[in-house]
Regions:
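Transmembrane alpha-helical segments and their boundary/interface "anchor" motifs
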Residues: 31-35, 69-75, 87-121, 131-135, ...
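Hydrophobic alpha-helical membrane-insertion segments
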Residues: 41, 109-122, 188-200, 281, ...
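Hydrophobic transmembrane alpha-helices
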Residues: 83-90, 170-178, 240-248, 289-301, ...
Length: 404
């Protein structure tokens, strides 16, 4: 097995810089398909948080069994975002064109999911944090240094806010990443990984130890800075950008997909032995970046993976919409079917194991159905209609041209 980096002359033909005006590289079906697999732990973690099992041992076992795999998936999505956007950036693109595509990729789905969440909250009689909901509408909630401020409405949209911050910076970041000499790309990747590792260290050293979070043995500000702060998460996106350039410049090591996947497992297991904040992304980010690049190379070289099959790609295409609807369905759906005590407070309903599992499966199926509707009824039409400016009609020719 070859483990030395490619020299530029060894780069696969499909990865050579394209002619001006051409899309830079082939579609990466495997990176679309893996989105769905990465989303499953997020769904299951949020389902575990609902505590639907009446057997406390089973309920806590479910939550403990999920460990930090949901956090790892979120880190993967940030790395993936930086990689794919860099990979697909067109030579003829401008910052305005890029921002326009991102705007109509994110906000139509977000606004529909926001309204859907508000309707569910009203139906469930859930309390509104007005300032939190306004910040969430504009995807600004992750800038507020308090996880409890983020924990309202459709809580998962904090990551969209981090994405939007990265998109705003992307043209500048891309210009900087493109200036890195190919021979130095791996050094820069290593330096960025050190930054990701330094973030929890900085949080634990500089930020106050209280008020404390209910999990992890850390304070709210420490948790926010490491996990939610958009600029902290942007570092993972930039790692994805650098790995895309490593592949495109022919500096990739010949790491098979299976080996990269094994490293992800090893990285995850290793992370569980470390303090809470280091589990979130500091340890998993390296194997996740390696897996992303190895899948991209497999697709670009025509080897592909099962993740690039039609069904997996279809599921991956639904993943963004699924991500936006699943948490309100789990959280407020649970409230809707739970009783209230004499004081009007919700008493979360629990079930035996078969009924609880059935409920989770139903929530998954409903989320998938709504994701399909949103993807086909909102996301795709919005992208077709508004993601690119309409071409101006050609000016009419001279009056006698038609007759000629």
């Amino acid at each position: 097995m070859q483990t030395t980096p490619h020299t530029p002359s060894q780069a696969p033909p499909s990865l050579v810089d394209p002619p001006p005006g051409k899309a830079p590289n082939p579609n990466l079906g495997s990176l679309t398909g893996i989105r769905f697999l990465a989303l499953l732990p997020v769904f299951l973690t949020h389902a575990a948080f609902e505590g639907v099992f009446s057997d406390a041992k089973l309920s806590w076992g479910f939550l403990d069994g999920m460990g930090s795999i949901g956090y790892t998936s979120v880190s993967f999505f940030f790395v993936l975002s930086g990689f794919v956007i860099t990979w697909s950036f067109r030579p003829t693109d401008t910052a305005r064109k890029f921002w326009r595509r991102r705007l109509f990729r994110v906000f139509p789905n977000h606004l529909v999911a926001y309204v859907f969440t508000v309707v569910l909250m009203l139906a469930a009689g859930s309390a509104f944090d007005a300032s939190g909901m306004v910040a969430q509408l504009f995807l600004l909630q992750a800038w507020v240094p308090d996880p409890l401020f983020i924990d309202t409405g459709n809580t998962v949209t904090w990551s969209l806010g981090a994405d939007v911050a990265f998109y705003a910076l992307f043209p500048l970041l891309l210009a900087a990443v493109r200036k890195i000499r190919p021979s130095r790309l791996w050094y820069w990747a290593g330096a960025l990984v050190l930054v990701v590792i330094a973030l929890p260290t900085l949080a634990l050293t500089v930020l106050p130890d209280s008020p404390a979070m209910s999990v992890g043995g850390v304070s709210r500000s420490q948790y926010w800075f490491t996990y939610f702060f958009p600029l902290s998460r942007a570092v993972e996106c930039v790692i994805g950008m650098v790995f895309a350039r490593i592949v495109l410049s022919g500096r990739w090591i010949r790491l098979p997909v299976t080996a990269a996947a094994a490293l992800v497992v090893v990285g995850y297991v290793t992370a569980q032995q470390l303090p809470f904040l280091y589990r979130l992304s500091a340890v998993p980010v390296v194997p996740l970046a390696l897996l992303t690049a190895s899948l991209a190379v497999a697709d670009a070289e025509g080897r592909g993976t099962f993740l690039g099959g039609r069904r997996m790609v279809w599921l991956g295409e639904l993943s963004f919409a699924f991500y936006l609807v699943h948490q309100p369905i789990l959280a407020y759906g649970h409230v809707l079917i739970s009783p209230r005590d004499a004081g009007g407070e919700v008493v979360p309903r629990t079930w035996d194991a078969p009924a609880g599992i059935t409920l989770i499966v139903v929530a998954f199926a409903v989320s998938m159905a709504l994701a399909w509707l949103m993807h086909n009824g909102v996301e795709k039409p919005a992208m077709r209609r508004w993601s690119r400016p309409r071409r101006r009609a050609a000016p009419p020719g001279p009056a006698g041209a038609a007759a000629a």
